[in-house]
Amino acid sequence: MLITWTHIILLLPILIIGMTTVIVMLSIAYRRNLFLHTSLTIFGFSLAIISVGLVWDQRDRNFLQLICVDDFSILYIILVLVSGLSSSVLAYKWLLIYPSNNRDEFYLLLLISSIGGILLATTNHLVILFLGMELISLPLFGLIGYSFFNKFSLEASIKYIILSGVSSSFILFGIALIYAATGFLSFTSISQLLRLHIIASNQSIFMSTIGLGMMMVGFGFKLSLVPFHLWTPDVYQGAPSSISLYLTTSSKIAVISVLIRLLMVFPNQYNTVFCIFLLGIACCSALFGNLMAIKQDNIKRVLAYSSIAHTGYVLIGVIAILRVNHPMALETIGIYLISYVLTSIGAFGIINIVSFFYAHEDTDVDSLFVYRGLFWHQPMLSVLFTIIILSLAGIPMTLGFIGKFYLFVLGIDSKLWWFTIFIAMSSVISIFYYLRIIINLYLSPINRLNINSDFLSSWSVTPDKIIVIIVSFSILFLGLYPKPLIYFMHLIYPPVL
């Protein structure tokens, strides 16, 4: 096949991140300079985000059997890149005090993982699916354990390595069964084969169903859905804040995109079984995640269980696609994921800012007790954190409310009555632990002898604080005036009249 400039433009995001990876790798080999490599990484992510605008204008988007750069994938590419950019900015301060000479490789691993995320968002082939899954997971083994001097980080890395290996084996075995049943690895070919009823053998239908089921189990591990969630709180607690952010945003978003695309391949006769499966997992994830978050005293563990619940909420949209192929499902999932990504960036950004100012290593910087009375020393930071937490809770006048409103309307319109009510009740439970965090900020302050005095008396503008301010403003603005967001989603997913 003749490769044209149009095809190169379609591949620009992944080519830019790939070239940035090579440049950073060669630069590290020549001379170690953390500021230079941070700047190169941020520039690469920013350029890749800008290049998505060029991809948007192209029409021949499905030019290879391996990948499919279409309207569906563009949103997820943007979210993966924004998450990678935010993680790069937040990591810089932490790497400045990192007690080792291997600081620069952090960005190398982050870039490679982002390539895997883009591949997952654009995959149209089971081989590329597995390649993207491994590319996004393998660098995370090192990134999660980057704080090797911290026992929690080592424990988190080991747990993630073991369970990620298990999930990859499920996905690979599922791919093998689907290939054995259909003889194809391309999503397009598999879809045509199944929809035209060319497979007449009950054995082949059974094998393809089991294969997809095993792949969904693997995706459940990656998405930390109940009952595949056991690694999540420990990994979020042990990993650096910037990597916890990356895990809860980019890693999950890429897997959600490939899950939706894969489920859309299979015809309607497969949907009933998987709807029941996803309904059970969604209910358990929403309820269990919120209940377990109530008794946590570590803010990272609270957000870990919160992410389990939020992933359960997203499954409303996935089920709506499977059950009735609702025309608003993709738009609803997109709006909810945008709100979730922005609020997660803000939450972990503030955690990163607060933890940086502790002078003693024996201080549990992620304890909720640390945030007690924060308003009386850092009122600006506390107000921003309040806005972000309210958005996570889905309180009106925030972007989180718009996302949940769309989800619940979609559930009702898809006639998922009891499921939507159950999810709404689970969401009410979450208000308890979110308000607990907010109230903690405004209580009487504690003795903060072990905190950098600059933190208690000044507000200096730094890149991580700029990100938190931008995110908080976006949450408020789009919560009060969501028309720009809805217009953006209509550009990606034109409404069906």
From Swiss-Prot:
Topology in membrane: Multi-pass membrane protein
Q: What EC number(s) would the UniProt record show?
A: 7.1.1.-
A molecular function annotated in GO for this UniProt entry is: quinone binding
Asked if the record carries the keyword Glycoprotein, the reply is no
| Reactions this protein catalyses | a quinone + NADH + 5 H(+)(in) = a quinol + NAD(+) + 4 H(+)(out)
The organism is Blochmanniella pennsylvanica (strain BPEN)
GO BP terms: namely:
ATP synthesis coupled electron transport
Specify where it is mainly localized. Answer: membrane
- UniProt subunit comment: NDH-1 is composed of 13 different subunits. Subunits NuoA, H, J, K, L, M, N constitute the membrane sector of the complex.
Its lineage opens with: Bacteria, Pseudomonadati, Pseudomonadota, Gammaproteobacteria, Enterobacterales
Q: Name one GO cellular component term.
A: plasma membrane
Name the protein family.
Answer: Belongs to the complex I subunit 2 family.
By its UniProt entry, which Pfam families does this protein fall under? Proton_antipo_M
The identity of this protein, by name, is NADH-quinone oxidoreductase subunit N
Where does it localize?
A: Cell inner membrane
InterPro entries of this UniProt entry?
NADH-Q_OxRdtase_suN/2, ND/Mrp_TM
Write out the transmembrane intervals. Answer: 8-28, 35-55, 72-92, 105-125, 126-146, 170-190, 210-230, 246-266, 274-294, 302-322, 333-353, 383-403, 426-446, 466-486
Biological role: NDH-1 shuttles electrons from NADH, via FMN and iron-sulfur (Fe-S) centers, to quinones in the respiratory chain. The immediate electron acceptor for the enzyme in this species is believed to be ubiquinone. Couples the redox reaction to proton translocation (for every two electrons transferred, four hydrogen ions are translocated across the cytoplasmic membrane), and thus conserves the redox energy in a proton gradient.
Enzyme group, top EC level?
translocase
Q: Which gene encodes it?
A: nuoN
| Keyword vocabulary terms for this entry | Cell inner membrane, Cell membrane, Membrane, NAD, Quinone, Translocase, Transmembrane, Transmembrane helix, Transport, Ubiquinone
